[in-house]
Amino acid sequence: MDLGTAESTRCTDPPAGKPPMAAKRKGGLKLNAICAKLSRQVVVEKGAEAGSQAEGSPLHPRDKERSGPESGVSRAPRSEEDKRRAVIEKWVNGEYCEDPAPTPVLGRIARDQELPPEGVYMVQPQGCSDEEDHAEEPSKDNSVLEEKESDGTASKDDSGPSTRQASGETSSLRDYAASTMTEFLGMFGYDDQNTRDELAKKISFEKPHAGSTPEVAASSMLPSSEDTLSKRARFSKYEEYIRKLKAGEQLPWPAHGSKAEDRAGKEVVGPLPSLRLPSNTAHLETKATILPLPSHSSVQMQNLVARASKYDFFIHKLKTGENLRPQNGSTYKKPSKYDLENVKYLHLFKPGEGSPDMGGAIAFKTGKVGRPSKYDVRGIQKPGPTKIPPAPSLVPTPLTNVPSAPSTPGPGPEPPASLSFNTPEYLKSTFSKTDSITTGTVSTVKNGLPTDKPAVTEDVNIYQKYIARFSGSQHCGHIHCAYQYREHYHCLDPECNYQRFTSKQDVIRHYNMHKKRDNSLQHGFMRFSPLDDCSVYYHGCHLNGKSTHYHCMQVGCNKVYTSTSDVMTHENFHKKNTQLINDGFQRFRATEDCGTADCQFYGQKTTHFHCRRPGCTFTFKNKCDIEKHKSYHIKDDAYAKDGFKKFYKYEECKYEGCMYSKATNHFHCIRAGCGFTFTSTSQMTSHKRKHERRHIRSSGALGLPASLLGAKDTEHEESSNDDLVDFSALSSKNSSLSASPTSQQSSASLAAAAAATTAEAIPSATKPPNSKMAGLLPQGLSGSIPLALALSNSGLPTTTPYFPLLPNRGSASLPVGSPGLLGSMSSGATTSATPDMPALMASRAGDSAPTAATSLSVPPASIIERISASKGLISPMMARLAAAALKPSATFDPGSGQQPTPTKFPQAQVKQEPDSAGTPGPHEASQDRSLDLTVKDPSNESNGHAVSANSSLLSSLMNKMSQGNPSLESFLSIKTEAEGSPAGEPSPFLGKAVKALVQEKLSEPWKVYLRRFGTKDFCDAQCDFLHKAHFHCVVEECGALFSTLDGAIKHANFHFRTEGGTAKGTPEASFPTSAAETKPPLAPSSLPAPPGTMVAGSSLEGPAPSPVSVPSTPTLLAWKQLASTIPQMPQIPSSVPHLPTSPLATTSLESAKPQVKPGFLQFQDNDPCLATDCKYASKFHFHCLFGNCKYVCKTSGKAESHCLDHINPSNSLVNVRDQFAYYSLQCLCPNQHCEFRMRGHYHCLRTGCYFVTNITTKLPWHIKKHEKAERRAANGFKYFTKREECGRLGCKYNQVNSHFHCIREGCQFSFLLKHQMTSHARKHMRRMLGKNFDRVPPSQGPPSLMDAETDEGMDYTGCSPGAASSESSTMDRSCSSTPVGNESTAAGNTISMPTASGAKKRFWIIEDMSPFGKRRKTASSRKMLDEGMMLEGFRRFDLYEDCKDTACQFSLKVTHYHCTRENCGYKFCGRTHMYKHAQHHDRVDNLVLDDFKRFKASLSCHFADCPFSGTSTHFHCLRCRFRCTDSTKVTAHRKHHGKQDVISAAGFCQFSSSADCAVPDCKYKLKCSHFHCTYPGCRHTVVGMSQMDSHKRKHEKQERGEPPAASPGAPVNLDGSLTLAAEQGSLLFLQTAAAGLGLLGDTGDPGPPVTASGTRDGPAAPTPAAAATTTTTTTATATATAGESSQEDDEELELPEEEAEDDDEDDDEEDDDDEDDDDDDDDEDLRTDSEESLPEAAGEAGARTPLAALGGPGPAPTAAS
């Protein structure tokens, strides 16, 4: 079938036609519009032609030339077109007859070509149709393209009508639907179907001479029935483009408009290509195309704005080769004024289809049609990057034409970048930011402009987006327009039939309609006016054709509104839903069915939320739970990245047979083949290191690639660590001394940065991980995994590294197991080994000589380099494994051209400067790694305490040196010619020292103190490790026993420290004898961040286990010399070629600019500290650089003394063994409950101290603690942690907060904050010395001691051993001594007064790189944990001890504890829970006091008829039968009792408005809450408690015999109803009523049985009048009865955040995972939102009033009868 295109014609007949025609017009439909519709008719060609053309038969060359862009389509014969056109024109003008007369028509056309334009023209200006919206080849002068007729009669300057070339021929206005033709034929009376069929026969290709009846003209446009007509699709010019391009045909896209113009005069374009309609009939729809004429003024045409069409975006995509999904198979939906294709995530289909329940025609979901809902997250979850379908904006943005620039086709929006599921961009809301539906509308107009804007030119108006203005000198281009050359307006929207306006008010009205419609789309609504038919999209709408209304376009939503305010409100609802979806939740309102039968809220008609994350079934109804649950998933993801899965006590463990399931929080290792289970996060790091060591051993720790080691039987288990991912690079906040968040780089940027300096770079983050934890890990984690140094075999996914890589590290993944590792490490290549790319060619990168990558003999020095690449992030065991492979002869000649880096000292990982252009040299390329500045090495941790990886402090310092670049050995040399010497030449000093260390590698210092026994060695018959590899300490009276080398080295280190370093040392390591020859300290501003500064700064990280630094023990002289020499680095200019300065800037060494002192980093005021949580941040202070020491201080004196303590550990330090008792298996500990009874450990011998530990490094710290306490006591104060019993009666802080006591005689002052110590001490001094005490200089009085005390108390508790004694003399040192190095300043030599506590931040020591800021358990924070003593109320059961509790899941399985308190029954593992649970009982005791009793859910309360017994944790009032599950009601009920006590004490009884007081004629009965006096013979009634007191005093005066005060006439009988006289029964009745009704709480449980006269009803709230008259005179009394809990709560509210930062002794030792959830039920009963207070009567709902809860008078308590 063809779409025939009529030639342009000119009709001289009057446009109005004959008078009878005008009478037949319907609804004001102008004949010119009808003629325009009929000017281009679609007719049916012969069946054979239609079939061949539908198949796209090839054309002859001549036909191809004539067809222009529509190649492949044949043309209809000219004569047939002329005949058909003549018939139509004659018929429209009423002149049609049986005989066709095409020739006169053609002749008339030819004769009238030179006449002025009159009659009917097919003219269209630019901007009036979507042909020119995105014209594919706009002409340079923006004029309309011309065409000549095929006979060539028209000349080039002919101004007559002509057809367009290219896209102009194929365009048919989509607004002319079949319904228009039906209306037209009906207007002419052709309603009979037979008549229409006859008309179809008259004008058809089967009868080329035309028929004899006028019906022929329209029959081809009519469907067989009205139903098919309504479902028929309409087509525009672009749909044919899309069809042709999808079919693989080529469309010529002329590059220049001028070329198209040239062709326009020579080519004649054929008819439109064939299109296949969705209808089954052979009829085609009417299509009318307005042909353009050249405009009189191209400038005026440029002022018209082209409309953007919905199809331009798709044409742009098809031109670029992209595919479009079919819509409804091979058919297309009906285009309309609502650009539904540009609406994001709507399900679209043909009109009339779909489910009405789903919101009409656009909500039906099919597999082929439409897009997923914006809420449909589950359908698009994929862990890898996915291609997101493009989502254009809701409304096409119009193109603006300016006179100076021709209109150009608007490029389609680029498809968005690939996003993974968990990126928030995927679900960004498409809701508009428009304020209102009416935004942008106009109310008044002046000359086509808004009144507030001046007219720029006459032709410019704000309506040009929708309406075009034509002046009197312009031709509008519409052939039937009767207002040619008169000022008028046309709508640019074909949907509006290019409606014409002459009134500016009509223009405003029409513009406002379009603006509101577009705004509605922006807000997600379709706007329909009364003239619009919304049934096409929303059939069955009751507002259709009645009023303006808005339909919500969201999938599944069928809301319709008539008010714009309702529209905005509904939009906010969808916005909230979208935000919830972005957060991973879905909300179901009370009227919505969540469809989840196992949901706890299913069928409850309540608003609730579901978590949408895979595998999570969590449901909740409180919004406050959203953030909590989000944090749960964040933690879960972090644990999963570390290889663990946490299960909470309230969830069932997925591991079968787990004894911790639903009992306590615990962890499972989810590595393949590992079944380790633990309860404390402190075990996580050690277990992680265990897998690490095992993996390194199996993957080639000795330098062999994994591919050369051969497969092992345990390969699956050994490689299970592939799933481990360190979380370090995801959270810079917790890498204390690393980089700031701004220095983090994505994996893509890391790969890009690495590619700049390497020959081959493969960003490994694009490869999906082969996760073995797929069942437990959330999807989408791989997208957030950073590049890192992955030590594994080549099969390890490089996106899941094990070792943490700091965010500023510049290299991409380097799989150590790959064969090309050694070459890539030495050349700086960043390769990623994958199963299909073994990275064998990686060693080619850089200019270095290739190394023997595939050889079995690997240079041992490369092992050092590989291990140092992770810098302190591997364990000492791995370091020694690598050291075992070292050969002293394996060295490189620096001058041989080979890479000098792998010599004894590995290179510093310093980023290359970006401006170092060109190919990096051998030295530069090897430096493309960044510096690691972590606080501590997690892998060097044992039992939560960081220790040095090697045996001595010399080893620690040598580690720092070993991580330096070999080009930086001038930093360590005392000679100053390093600046001029070649950077790659190692200094003689370094060569000698390192050579000595390597040669002495076997003389490890632990051999001095310990002896190793192998599996065949016999040590002792009673040794626990007999016939196993272990170590015995040979020091007298020690007897320590170790099964690992780690423990042996640590123990030897302890002995070395305690014995003053007297172990034999090797004198070969000759160090410089003086520091005077070194250059002055490097100025901070001399270099951005010199590598030398980084070498010294890297000491902050903690010792890296470099194998070359294990051996010899130093002498004291060497210590002092080395400590004073190493940090003093000569300044190296940035011009040194092989020393590129590091761009490491973000809050690191460059911006902090610390001055390196001997063993210290000094920070000036306002310098950003490297430690993000440093309590002295932005102040003048010092950080210790020795080993793992975390000491920080504010004075240079303390810094110097602390440094000396490191250099000489025996400096005024008594032997620690004199103050501790050591117990081992040979000498068992006398304490049966000691935690370390079966191991070697120490007990403190101080009186009253129960400290016990098996970690020797804690002993000096503990001594310091005692000395600190002694100094504090000398100043008159004592400190207690919140876990210590202070013993002072009435102390409100006892076991509640860490606090201080003044221990001066007669002073009971207790306080929380350390700075109060100074002010309180000054108060005592003023009392002793008088008011003038303040004038005493601080240096001469006790306040200086206080300053020293407070300042010293803020030092790190994790300071090095040996610092204890120095603290006692800090006052003298700080005032007298001069710091080492020429850095003496006044600020460094004086003691600063402590500032406000608000400026003191606690310095948490980060334990790992998790995103939760986990705090390492410093020795002080684990005080109670290490003391080994049992808290009162608990009992410990050893591993093989039967607890004889049948309900205990831990019995005979693990060491555990039982709470022995009444009605508790809590059982747990791990001592941490003991202190938390004890605090829980303290809170509960403060809550229940002596008038309530608490019962856990697991225990029976033994109260009859209690529904909570054994099911819920609940409370029972001991004064009445009230019970509740909500802890907040306990206090309220207690206040109620207090109020009732006050009422009873005043001699009154309360009755609520719902309780019958049984007093005849009481005017308050059953009306409001009131009170009756219970005094015998008194009939007084009051409504407020304020009146009770005066009435009570009157009775007291009567009892004393005083005359009553004058009163205005019988005030006693206010209601005249109380006639009790002195009867005994009356008083008994009121007292009984008071007893039965006065104790109502939350439930109103029935009290004792009452007499028949005392019926009890549920209480009601008092009336407003009664409430207004009440007062709170009993507030004080009620508060007093509330107990001490409220007082303590109020005081706790006043506590600042630093409530007890002293000594860090009060640091919470609870694990991070335990802080969120209390043990078992801890606070679930203290902070619940349950509404269960067990009301026993319906009327009891109003029992408690806010006034009663506040302590004021409430309603009289009653109980249900």
From Swiss-Prot:
Compositionally biased region (Low complexity): 1659-1685, 1741-1750
SMART domains: ZnF_C2H2
ZnF start-end (C2H2-type): 550-574, 609-633, 667-691, 1031-1055, 1300-1324, 1457-1481, 1515-1537, 1571-1595
Molecular-function GO term, any one: DNA binding
Tissue specificity note: Expressed in the brain stem and the thalamencephalon.
Metal-binding among keywords: yes
Cross-link (Glycyl lysine isopeptide (Lys-Gly) (interchain with G-Cter in SUMO2)): 287, 975
Composition bias type Acidic residues, residue spans: 1686-1734
Ranges of compositional bias, category Pro residues: 386-395, 406-416, 1081-1091
Family matches, as InterPro entries: CASZ1, Znf_C2H2_type
Described purpose of this protein according to its UniProt entry: Transcription factor involved in vascular assembly and morphogenesis through direct transcriptional regulation of EGFL7.
Protein name in UniProt: Zinc finger protein castor homolog 1
Gene label: Casz1
